Amino acid sequence: MTTNYIFVTGGVVSSLGKGIAAASLAAILEARGLNVTMMKLDPYINVDPGTMSPIQHGEVFVTEDGAETDLDLGHYERFIRTKMSRRNNFTTGRIYSDVLRKERRGDYLGATVQVIPHITNAIKERIVAGGEGHDVVLVEIGGTVGDIESLPFLEAIRQLAVDIGREHALFMHLTLVPYMAAAGEVKTKPTQHSVKELLSIGIQPDILICRSDRAVPANERAKIALFCNVAEKAVISLKDVDSIYKIPGLLKSQGLDDYICKRFSLNVPEANLSEWEQVIYEEANPAGEVTIGMVGKYIELPDAYKSVIEALKHGGLKNRVTVNIKLIDSQDVETRGVEILKDLDAILIPGGFGYRGVEGKIATARFARENNIPYLGICLGMQVALIEFARNVVGMENANSTEFVPDCKYPVVALITEWRDEDGNVEVRTEKSDLGGTMRLGAQACQVSEDSLVRKMYGSTTITERHRHRYEVNNMLLKQIEAAGLRIAGRSGDDQLVEIIEVPNHPWFVACQFHPEFTSTPRDGHPLFAGFVKAASEYQKRQAK
């Protein structure tokens, strides 16, 4: 089957939810038996988001092959079964870097290197490579139509639609249709102007997704269709909903997938959305609720922990409970004390970098351990739990990580200095190495101890999880820590690195070096998060007695 492309753009304002809308459409097409993948093209100059501040950009989503990507790829994986890879996300910076490298090598044979055709050709090549082997590819263009940064991408997809034939390309434009309370009606003019901007670039949208806080009336959709030169049945109303998992059904009810399949001449079965209906039912009919405190340093922007937040919700679905997440700044724990952690049913410390707020996280881990509160530590959350145990149980005064105190007496967490690249070559890295692209990244095998709590949750002694870190447990001090009672519940496939720790005399204290949140989905959940939320429910019941 020839690969078909749906190019997704956004207009009027940012943060309309292009990623969610595109992923929801992909879920419907997948439910019709099509092999679907998605791509995100980001117009910023950074080569990837790996070194960008989470407060500015949100979380960095790590793929199985170790790419540091936009958080939208997390949405994609939560909505469709296809696993994303480094082919599914690239930036302006990556494109320019590749083109300039070719220019330095002389690949362009002395030609003047320009945005058109060299940059646009590079973009097209990456899109085609990312879509190979799939029936339908949804390509989301970051930013808003009208932004200078997006122009090379828009020109590239305009050209690509011509190259592959318009019978295999659709342009879907997401736009805002605001409701004006004073007039008592929605306004279509912003949408008309946004489409006009697209037309000036040479792109005629085939589908318009109209975002609004309410359903856009049929007469207004007809008006939009007339003035934007779009088929009336291709003007879709996408109102605000209380659950993003209702969006696939909302789009399907308006015949969006039928319209697309007809345009692409795809003779496929009707979509079966029963799995999504089950998710919606579980979300709407909880048997209880728990409150979980998440102690971090980027809490002013919840998107910095997007996958963790979603994974906690998925854990709630698997236990039929609503998970109320209380975001707590770790610096507040330092200044106000652990009293602010009271009345929580469980505590989670997610990943992070840098010393700010670390002592608050260490105090949090101690509070959870000493008060038998369920604890899940992820990445840095495992490292602070280890530091706390070393200080207060083993007796290693001022134990720390060399990330925070390079010359500390007890460096229980230290930099991994020898790494193997994707070709198997040994590469030495130090504190002076570049920050970008120099971490242990992607899916890594882990051997789980038979007698561990984690073994019961996973149901297996061999698991694979995604990583993003450059510091690890210092094996030189491990014997003393184990002798004091800490259980090493999981190690890397080569038995060299500690992956999971547990406190055996605690009802539920688990910490892992990997990031389980990246593989959690609403339909399948994740063993660790399901077990963690279950432990929170059980703790709540014990406290109520």
UniProtKB/Swiss-Prot annotation:
The keyword ATP-binding applies. PROSITE patterns: GATASE_TYPE_1. CTP binds at S14, D147, I148, E149, K187, T188, K189, P190, T191, Q192, K223. The keyword Cell membrane does not apply. It comes from the Bacteria. Residues 291-542 form the Glutamine amidotransferase type-1 domain. One of its GO terms (cellular component) is cytosol. Allosterically activated by GTP, when glutamine is the substrate; GTP has no effect on the reaction when ammonia is the substrate. The allosteric effector GTP functions by stabilizing the protein conformation that binds the tetrahedral intermediate(s) formed during glutamine hydrolysis. Inhibited by the product CTP, via allosteric rather than competitive inhibition. GO terms for molecular function: ATP binding; CTP synthase activity; glutaminase activity; identical protein binding; metal ion binding. InterPro entries: Class_I_gatase-like (IPR029062), CTP_synthase (IPR004468), CTP_synthase_N (IPR017456), GATASE (IPR017926), GATase1_CTP_Synthase (IPR033828), P-loop_NTPase (IPR027417). It catalyses: UTP + L-glutamine + ATP + H2O = CTP + L-glutamate + ADP + phosphate + 2 H(+); L-glutamine + H2O = L-glutamate + NH4(+); UTP + NH4(+) + ATP = CTP + ADP + phosphate + 2 H(+). L-glutamine binds at G352, L380, G381, M382, Q383, E403, R470. Mg(2+) binds at D72, E140. ATP binds at S15, L16, G17, K18, G19, I20, D72, K239, D240, V241. Residues 1-266 are annotated as: Amidoligase domain. UTP binds at S14, K187, T188, K189, P190, T191, Q192, K223. The active site is at C379 (nucleophile), H515, E517. It holds the Pfam family GATase. CTPSs have evolved a hybrid strategy for distinguishing between UTP and CTP. The overlapping regions of the product feedback inhibitory and substrate sites recognize a common feature in both compounds, the triphosphate moiety. To differentiate isosteric substrate and product pyrimidine rings, an additional pocket far from the expected kinase/ligase catalytic site, specifically recognizes the cytosine and ribose portions of the product inhibitor. Catalyzes the ATP-dependent amination of UTP to CTP with either L-glutamine or ammonia as the source of nitrogen. Regulates intracellular CTP levels through interactions with the four ribonucleotide triphosphates. Homotetramer. Belongs to the CTP synthase family. This is CTP synthase.
